[in-house]
Regions:
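Conserved helicase/translocase motor-coupling segment
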Residues: 50, 54-56
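C-terminal boundary/linker segments immediately following FHA domains
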Residues: 144-179
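Asparagine-centered strand-capping/turn motif at beta-strand->loop junctions
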Residues: 134-138
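Cys/His-rich microdomains that often coordinate metals
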Residues: 61-69, 79-82
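C-terminal lobe helix-coil module of Hanks-type protein kinase domains
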Residues: 1-41, 45
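N-terminal beta-hairpin/loop module of FHA
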Residues: 82-124
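Short, solvent-exposed loop/linker segments at beta-strand-coil boundaries, enriched for Pro/Gly
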Residues: 140-142
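Short cysteine-rich clusters marking metal-coordination/redox-active sites
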Residues: 56-60, 72-76
Length: 179
């Protein structure tokens, strides 16, 4: 009767993985102690994944991407084609490579739980906006593996074109680009 109106109204807009996590955490089994509840780390990873799935539609509004398939803007209904994805740490994080998306330390360092420090971003080529790249904002050197298997160093401020590489070797992690 109005108490949970926003929860009910917005529930369908959220990606399935976040809805599933709330159902798991608030299930009868979890609440009674028969099943373990998600840990703080589980929630942190889940909300990082949720943050990673937010993109800005051409209509100017934010929307969620659906993992592994085309998405539709929750505001205007426009189709958003499935972008390439940076699979970090064997699927721990699947980061859609969409202009404006940030790479955080937890994405590039498999031992880190730092979800706030930005170490890279997806940018558009100013001369050709259809070409996207990963800009290294960190002091670490990344090694971009090209489609033919060669390694190319990507230092601070440098950009690795998304469609020309198949992986990025971070000092303490690996990201595979899935197109």
């Amino acid at each position: 009767r109005g108490v949970h109106a926003n929860v009910v109204r917005f529930w369908p807009m959220y990606p399935k993985f976040i809805r599933d996590k709330f159902v798991e955490a608030l299930s009868k089994e979890a609440m009674s102690g028969k099943m373990p509840r998600p840990t703080d780390n589980d929630w942190q990873q889940c909300f990082t994944r949720l943050r990673d799935s937010i993109v800005t539609c051409a209509c100017g509004e934010e929307t969620f991407l659906t993992q592994g398939e085309d998405s539709f803007c929750i505001n205007c209904g426009r189709k958003i084609p499935k972008p390439p994805v940076l699979n970090c740490h064997s699927g721990k994080y699947d980061l859609p490579l969409f202009p404006g998306v940030k790479l955080y330390r937890c994405h590039v360092d498999k031992l880190s739980d730092d979800y706030t420090e930005v170490l890279g971003e997806v940018v558009r080529n100013p001369n050709n906006p259809g070409i996207w790249g990963l800009r290294n904002l960190s002091d670490m050197v990344w090694n971009a593996e090209t489609l033919d298997g060669e390694l190319r160093s990507v230092g601070k401020g440098q950009i690795a074109p998304v469609m020309q590489i198949k992986a990025i070797h971070f000092p303490n992690g690996l990201g595979i680009i899935e197109k």
